[in-house]
From Swiss-Prot:
This is UPF0060 membrane protein Bcep1808_1236. It is found in: Cell inner membrane. The chain crosses the membrane at residues 9-29, 34-54, 66-86. Pfam families: UPF0060. InterPro entries: UPF0060 (IPR003844). One of its GO terms (cellular component) is plasma membrane. It comes from Burkholderia vietnamiensis (strain G4 / LMG 22486).
Length: 110
């Protein structure tokens, strides 16, 4: 269980770095925010790429498992940053995605 918590926490930090790296350009392009926001966006995406190298599995498995956590963090972002109420469908989808992540991340190793 400790390994799952460690992996999930690393995935969550990775997801935040990716979301920030994509959200800031969105603010520039859609929200008319200053262009200098592209600098921290690029740094955040570089951090995201580096964080992916810290995950314990092969790249493909890491990306597959990461997707589940990304969905949960993106929904949290939707609620906290965008102020949109989550639906029971959001919660059910996140639960399914996180269950899939756990299966991939915690499978027995040969």
């Amino acid at each position: 269980m400790t390994e799952l918590i460690r992996i999930a926490a690393l995935f969550a930090v990775t997801a935040v770095a990716e979301i920030v790296g994509c959200y800031l350009p969105w603010l520039v392009l859609k929200g008319g925010r200053p262009v200098w926001l592209l600098v921290p966006a690029a740094l955040s995406l570089a951090l995201f790429a580096w964080l992916l190298t810290l995950h314990p599995s092969a790249a493909g498995r890491t990306y597959a498992a990461y997707g589940g956590v990304y969905i949960g963090v993106a929904l949290l972002w939707l609620r906290v940053v965008d102020g949109v109420a989550l639906t029971r469908w959001d919660a059910a989808g996140a639960a399914l995605a996180l269950g899939g992540m756990a299966m991939i991340a915690l499978q027995p190793r040969a």
